[in-house]
């Protein structure tokens, strides 16, 4: 009899655990996917699959390089054949044409460089039909690509002029002294080196590793673009090289100040309008209504701002003048459009975030930091514990602005993948989905959401758990599947406690969710194949925020498992 009872208890325990499995988990554990063979595709089908996530990007790179090559070639041929420049060609040789052709490419790049960082302009453009043709979400990538082109052709221009200055010095018997004079006392020389210094200062602090190590340094040095554009405007106005025949160049001090400013004036005007708009938006009444300290050094800031409309998946630029007057940092909104406030979850990892958290009253060094708690409420609120009411520092908010995650409702199936604090873009989206399920006002194409969250430690689940619990409770149709993965090594005592508490339970011992926690890293092969099997034919959007390496892996799997009848469309956060 005891043997029967043991068997019956074990059977009920397994039944209880299985009842918590999501449809995708059941399919993956059934072994059905292990025997599925990859479909053989025709060349046309392979091309169509390649076009889904790679084609437009590769096409853009090709067009970008082609245009630059054409501009350089046009400039070189023009200056090589122009009759009025024969004397210059005789003095300097081919490096004269190279320098001038590189300058022409720089004109082209300088005309483009500011448009991608005009955030309001990009957000408005995302709402037009052009968004289906131009990938406005790649605005930062385009800005970086253009910047590297400016660096490359600036050095081509500089090195070519080194030879030109050497030729002048040699033909006038001035030696190395003459070479130095031409470089550092001539108008084109000293303005060029000033621009080059500003440019390299911006570039060297913008590379990913230095930028992440010290964002404040990146922020301040990037404003040397003002120096760059100012000297760019006068760099060509010194008329150091005159044409052989009229019309002759008119130098500074008489009638002209050059024409280089004409190339960046349009982007510069829009960017200036953006900065003015930022200051005007900052004048709207904005204040912090509540501050919540979460485990894992996460600070939640709830903000009230007049005249602000948001959409799920958007982000803002946040400034706290008490910490820094000039710095604006990007944070993804974790509040839903349906809520009467906007919120961000700020991970305290750098100087700026550490100082902001301190100013807000967060104390992460305390022993009771393993539970979420309210640490501050706006002093005008009389409905809370007086001990929590305080005068909170003033903040400025610029935005909100669009992002790739904003497109989550465009697809029939959406796969949301967040690693650690990278879950923040999906907090807003999941909340909005929850509101739409409970208070339906408009139809949406979205019918299924897979949310995958990968964390290293137990505390990472704490601050987000209440939202996930609310979603599970209301999601009677199982439209949202939650898959949590714990990647940290588990101590023996912790593992024992988990097994005891999880046995015969209808909730997970770690998260409190109905869906069980998975240990280790996700098997992306099985996950992508399972989603495709369950939903073909359909189109799934894959949205990710987290480490670059994992993003590259997911990008590869999106390409690998797209086929006729089912497409995985790749999307990633860009700030």
Where are these regions (language model features)?
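A generic structural motif
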Residues: 299-303, 340-348
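Membrane-proximal cytosolic interface modules of multi-pass membrane proteins
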Residues: 233, 266, 270-318, 330
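Extended, low-complexity, polar regulatory segments
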Residues: 1-51, 485
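Membrane-embedded alpha-helical bundles of multi-pass integral membrane proteins
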Residues: 43-280
